[in-house]
Amino acid sequence: FFLDDCAQGEAVIGKCSDYMQFKEAETEMYPAFGNNEMRLDWMKKLSDAQIVLPRLIHATAYVSPTAEVGAGTVVLPLAIINTDCRIQSGCIINCGSIVDHGCVIEEGVHISPGTVIKAENRIPRATKIEAGEVVPLRAYPL
């Protein structure tokens, strides 16, 4: 089920502003907004309310054992996060994207489908990297 201000249907059980009605001891909530700043704002609201923000990693995604993935980040099918990457909170690592070794992806970044982030880049907070884009080695220096 989910909360949504615009969508309708059986799975929609309320508006986003109703979130506190669904808070229980073990409740986890993910702010599934495509707008990076809105997602970060909602992450803060949920965190301030002591609601757990899960890490959602698809079974077909690969995350290196030496990589770190922050709370409230989603890693979608066939995405790859290589060695020593730090993915901060609230990011979307979309389908088939590759984050090469040693990258830092700051909070709220959306890496679109099929994107390649080459090694040793620091992608700034709330940036959206468009689908299929290749970010060259050290284009955003660490």
Regions found by a protein language model. Name each.
Residues G9, E26, Q50-I51, G132:
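A generic structural signal for alpha->beta connector loops
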Residues P31, N35, R39-I57:
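Glycine/small-residue-rich loop that forms an oxyanion/phosphate-binding "nest" at active or ligand-binding sites
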Residues L56-L142:
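Structural signal for interior beta-strand "rungs" in well-ordered beta-sheet cores
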Residues F1-F33:
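A solvent-exposed beta-alpha-beta segment
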Residues Q8, E37, Y62-V63:
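Short secondary-structure capping/turn micro-motifs that flank functional sites
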Residues V12-I13, D48, G72-V74:
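Short, hinge-like loop/turn segments at secondary-structure boundaries
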Residues M20-E24, K44-D48, T66-A67:
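Short, charge-rich binding segments
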